[in-house]
Design a protein with these regions (language model features):
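Conserved alpha/beta-hydrolase
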Residues: 51-77
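N-terminal cap/lid segment of alpha/beta-hydrolase-fold proteins
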Residues: 1-25
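Active-site glycine-rich loops that stabilize anionic/oxyanionic intermediates
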Residues: 39-42
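Alpha/beta-hydrolase active-site loop
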Residues: 83-103
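Alpha/beta-hydrolase fold nucleophile elbow
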Residues: 106-116
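Residue-level detector of conserved catalytic or cofactor/ligand-binding positions
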Residues: 165-171
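Active-site nucleophile loop of the alpha/beta-hydrolase fold
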Residues: 138-147
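Gly/Ala-rich beta-loop-alpha elbow adjacent to hydrolase catalytic centers
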Residues: 115-119, 123
């Protein structure tokens, strides 16, 4: 059984309310907490089935919709757009804010983090900026390429995301 709750918290941008979800197991001892960082054009609710399966194993799961994603997208906002300025670090700081909330709620339970696709890159940045804050990390759907390939790939991904955001938001 799962106790699912939704919550909001203020982004590190100081203006956007971020939507989050918390899946807590019922009737099973809590063994760990997993914080999920979703990919581009995704939202945290996509991980519902996965979270419920982990709950059966005693793992609490939590995550939030990053800036410009899911229910964190302000009315009239641009999908998959983090905002102006150094927003990559803002999103990483948002991950840390949720981490702190989870640590406060579960102080004696190992806290782990998982990032998928874009979330894997956010997670990698998080691990560099906030070392020692998690017991384990799962990095999936990620990559490593030479700088030139990454620069070109990021430019292409940004262009594709800009076009796709005009015509489709993932379900």
């Amino acid at each position: 059984m799962t106790n699912l709750s939704e919550f909001t918290f203020l982004s590190s941008d100081g203006k956007t309310q971020l939507h989050g979800m918390l899946w807590e197991p019922e009737g099973v001892a809590v063994r760990a907490v997993l914080q999920i960082c979703h990919g581009v054009a995704e939202h945290i609710a996509r991980y519902d089935g996965f979270a419920r399966a982990l709950n059966e194993q005693g793992i609490v799961v939590a995550g939030h919709d990053h800036l410009g994603h899911g229910k964190s997208l302000p009315e009239g906002g641009t999908p998959v757009y983090f905002g102006d300025g150094n927003t990559w670090n803002t999103v990483v700081d948002d991950i840390y804010v949720l981490h702190q909330r989870l640590k406060q709620r579960y102080p004696d339970v190992p806290l782990c983090i998982m990032g998928h696709s874009m979330g894997s890159f956010l997670t990698r940045t998080y691990l560099i900026r906030y070392p020692g804050t998690v017991k384990a990390a799962v990095i999936m759907g990620t990559g490593w390429q030479p700088r030139a390939a990454i620069t070109g790939g990021l430019a292409l991904a940004n262009a594709i995301a800009a076009v796709l955001s005009l015509i489709h938001i993932s379900e």
